């Protein structure tokens, strides 16, 4: 099975700028509640992926998002892991 290359921080930031709502501070939990421009919370995508083991393309299909949006959410998660992990623990347990 081929491994996919993890994007660089600059590549992550480019996707985040394009696909993640830049006004995350308007959400109740701030950066932990950031959403894609389609309105899907990043924490929900990450929690769903953990629970299902879905790969990027399966996750994109399940949420009717492009793979690039999922990549942006994963990049945002890498940059804000402690906030999003806390949000997941509060919500999912």
Task: Please describe what each predicted stretch is.
Residues 38-54:
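Short, amphipathic alpha-helical "recognition" segments used to contact nucleic acids or chromatin
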Residues 68-79:
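Major-groove recognition helix of helix-turn-helix-like DNA-binding domains
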Residues 16-41:
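Short, Lys/Arg-enriched anionic-surface-contact patches
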């Amino acid at each position: 099975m081929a491994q996919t290359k993890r994007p660089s921080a600059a590549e992550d930031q480019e996707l985040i700028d394009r696909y993640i709502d830049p006004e995350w501070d308007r959400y109740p939990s701030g950066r932990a509640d950031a959403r894609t421009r389609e309105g899907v919370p990043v924490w929900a995508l990450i929690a769903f992926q953990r629970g299902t083991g879905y790969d990027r393309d399966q996750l994109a299909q399940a949420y009717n998002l492009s793979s690039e949006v999922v990549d942006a959410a994963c990049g945002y998660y890498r940059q804000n892991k402690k906030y999003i992990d806390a949000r997941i623990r509060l919500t999912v347990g």
